[in-house]
Amino acid sequence: MERRELTYKICLIGDGGVGKTTYINRVLDGRFEKNYNATVGAVNHPVTFLDDQGNVIKFNVWDTAGQEKKAVLKDVYYIGASGAIFFFDVTSRITCQNLARWVKEFQAVVGNEAPIVVCANKIDIKNRQKISKKLVMEVLKGKNYEYFEISAKTAHNFGLPFLHLARIFTGRPDLIFVSNVNLEPTEVNYDYHSPEESKYIDYMEQASKMAPEE
C-alpha cells in the first residue's frame, strides 16, 4: 500500500484566554505555560502524526493568537480551512455562550460542511463549577459536534480532537495514530473513550519500546 502525506488546514477558535495557544504548545512539545505573552497575528503551527498505515498526517494549525476581535483578519484565517477546533473555558459561562457566534462566523466563510470539534478546556481546575455538556449543546442549538473535555495543563485528551478530524478527513473511522511526531509518546495522557483510543495507546507504547536507544 502506497504511503501518503496528507495535509489539512485547521483553525483554533474561541475567546482570548481560553487556552488555545497553551493547548497547541502542549501538543507540539509537551510544554505548559500558565502565563505567556499573546502572539500578535495568526500563527501557523505544523502538527504531524503518523497513522497505522504509515501515512503522515499533517495539520497546519492556525491560531488566531490575540486577533479574536479583528473581524477582517478572521476571514483571512478561516479561508481554505478543512475544519476547526473551538475552545471555551469550562469554568466560564461567557466563553461558552460565545461559541455560537464563533461557529456562525466560521461557517459564514467556510460553509457548513467543514467538521467541527468543541473542546471544554481547563477541566483540571478544582473547586469551581464546571459548565455541563448539556448547556454547551443548548448554546450550539443541538448541533451534533464532537465534544471533548481536555486539559492543556495535564495533557488530558489533548490528541483526541486531531484523531477525530483525521478519521473524518480520511474516511477511516478506525484510523489510529501510532505516534505524535511532535512529542514523545510517554507524554500522552488519554481518557480511553473507546477500543480505538485504547488501541492507539497500545501502538504508542510499542513505538516507544521499539525506538533505538541514544
Curated annotation (Swiss-Prot):
Instruction: Enumerate the SUPFAM superfamilies for this protein.
Output: P-loop containing nucleoside triphosphate hydrolases
Show the disulfide pairing. Answer: none
Domain of life (superkingdom): Eukaryota
- The UniProt annotation puts the region (Switch-II) at 66-82
Q: Where does GTP bind?
A: 17-22, 66, 121-124, 151-153
Which terms does the record give in the GO molecular function aspect? GTP binding; GTPase activity
Q: Which PROSITE patterns match?
A: RAN
Region annotation (Switch-I) maps to: 34-42
Q: Where in the cell is it found?
A: Nucleus
Which Gene Ontology terms describe the biological processes this protein takes part in?
Answer: protein import into nucleus; ribosomal subunit export from nucleus
Gene3D superfamilies (alphabetical): P-loop containing nucleotide triphosphate hydrolases
Q: Where is the Small GTPase Ran-type domain?
A: 4-172
The record's section on InterPro entries has: P-loop_NTPase, Ran_GTPase, Small_GTP-bd, Small_GTPase
Q: Give the UniProt keywords, A-Z.
A: GTP-binding, Nucleotide-binding, Nucleus, Protein transport, Transport
Report the GO terms under cellular component. cytoplasm; nucleus
Could you describe the subunit structure of this protein? Answer: Found in a nuclear export complex with RanGTP, exportin and pre-miRNA.
Q: PANTHER family from the xrefs?
A: GTP-BINDING NUCLEAR PROTEIN RAN, RAN GTPASE
General function of this protein? GTP-binding protein involved in nucleocytoplasmic transport. Required for the import of protein into the nucleus and also for RNA export.
NCBIfam families named among the record's database cross-references: small_GTP (TIGR00231)
What's this protein's family per the entry? Belongs to the small GTPase superfamily. Ran family.
Q: What is this protein called?
A: GTP-binding nuclear protein GSP1
Species of provenance? Encephalitozoon cuniculi (strain GB-M1)
Chain's gene name: GSP1
